[in-house]
Amino acid sequence: MLEPNKGIQINEVEGEIYLVEFGDGRDKKRFLEMCPWTYEKYLILLRELEGKQVPKEISLWQSPFWMQIHNLPLKSQTRETGRAIGAKLGEVMDVNVAEFGVHWGKSLRVRVKIDIHKKLVRGKKIVIEGGEQRWIAFKYERLPNFFL
């Protein structure tokens, strides 16, 4: 759980929309990086505001999730591959690979901002080197009840 350096203030704006104010910008950055947040396994949607929005115009329809891409050949577990596959599902925020650019493991982790109104994609057929088709499976981390 987040333990802020200089406190957090939460105020209801309208209906189920709340404004969270941080006393320290580093706390806010860390809070947003740790998304998704849940309460009793229900998703809490967060969005950084500019301050110009009217409460009724605030759209909350995306949330970041870490997904694992399974069944990729080892040499394909790169930042570029993660970005290309992740971009088909949403906005890619991060690909978890070493600094030298390749991940040697059973899956490649990609952080993707997903539209919560769409069904989750469980996998996809891709063409790998040599023209072979392969099914790659997607597993999502820390899914809330909303998606189950």
Say what each PLM segment does.
Residues M1-L148:
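Glycine- and charge-enriched interaction patches
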